[in-house]
Amino acid sequence: MKGQSMILKDLAAELEEVVSPINLDCEEEIETEEVDCPAPFAVEAVCHVCEQVLRLAVVASPDGILQLQQLLLTDSLSFLCTSCSREAFCNRRPQRNGS
């Protein structure tokens, strides 16, 4: 250090003046907002290939569940079990987004 020689006691006193302690135990309360967390829905479907029963849990709005139900009932969406999925994608890269 250049200038006056300082001792640890002086340094601590200087730092104490610069850093004023803040009381973190104040009586202030923050209002908490409750977030609506939709309940999960149980979906049962069958594998498109082997017809094994598949059980899924999904979280969606009531409109989303209705849309999923319509997709499943019109055969425009089908699921594969893990075994059939592995067999379908064995030795090739899965196509993405229908391409």
Swiss-Prot record:
GO terms for molecular function: DNA binding; DNA-binding transcription factor activity; protein domain specific binding; zinc ion binding. A zinc finger (unnamed) spans 47-84. GO terms for biological process: DNA-templated transcription; symbiont-mediated perturbation of host cell cycle G1/S transition checkpoint; symbiont-mediated suppression of host innate immune response; symbiont-mediated suppression of host type I interferon-mediated signaling pathway. The keyword DNA-binding applies. Highly phosphorylated. A motif (LXCXE motif) lies at residues 24-28. Keywords: Activator, DNA-binding, Early protein, G1/S host cell cycle checkpoint dysregulation by virus, Host cytoplasm, Host nucleus, Host-virus interaction, Inhibition of host innate immune response by virus, Inhibition of host interferon signaling pathway by virus, Interferon antiviral system evasion, Metal-binding, Modulation of host cell cycle by virus, Oncogene, Transcription, Transcription regulation, Viral immunoevasion, Zinc, Zinc-finger. It is found in: Host cytoplasm; Host nucleus. Coiled coil: none annotated. The E7 terminal domain is an intrinsically disordered domain, whose flexibility and conformational transitions confer target adaptability to the oncoprotein. It allows adaptation to a variety of protein targets and exposes the PEST degradation sequence that regulates its turnover in the cell. Homodimer. Homooligomer. Interacts with host RB1; this interaction induces dissociation of RB1-E2F1 complex thereby disrupting RB1 activity. Interacts with host EP300; this interaction represses EP300 transcriptional activity. Interacts with protein E2; this interaction inhibits E7 oncogenic activity. Interacts with host TMEM173/STING; this interaction impairs the ability of TMEM173/STING to sense cytosolic DNA and promote the production of type I interferon (IFN-alpha and IFN-beta). This is Protein E7. The gene is E7.
